[in-house]
Amino acid sequence: MKELKDVIAALSVKDQKAKINSIKANAMGGSLGLSGTFDTQDTLKPVVDFDIDVKDMIIAKVFTDITTANKLVPLLADANGNFSMNMDFHSDMDGELNPILNSINASGNFISKEVGLDSVAALEKIAELVKYPALKNPSLKDINIKFLIKDGRVTADPFETFI
């Protein structure tokens, strides 16, 4: 995250483990809430375990600026709209303190009133094949997706949306 504003934090550090009681900040057009632990007892393999709460962030900004988010769901880097999300997130960290992709385990909900998807090659091809032009640049409405990340692989429960 490149810029956090109006940060309020309560944390403690003991035995190479930061316990984050609460961090609240404004970022990427919305707000972020975070609590959990950052454990560096094994200095070669730090571990994070966070509860993350996102409200009304700009989708494209998050999925462009946060490398891990982009690697997990690259499709959303070109999406339009805002989203909210709650997520339990666990990961090992590398030497630069970035999550190690294949160690990420998480679950949560992705919620948005509307997500616009522009210039997605797969959707454009499907739109041509089924002769349904609305699929070329769809705008998905009233999204509530329950997702799971297991060892860095994202899956989602079936969900309904309107185009």
Residue ranges and their predicted role:
Residues M1-I163:
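Small-residue helix/turn framework positions
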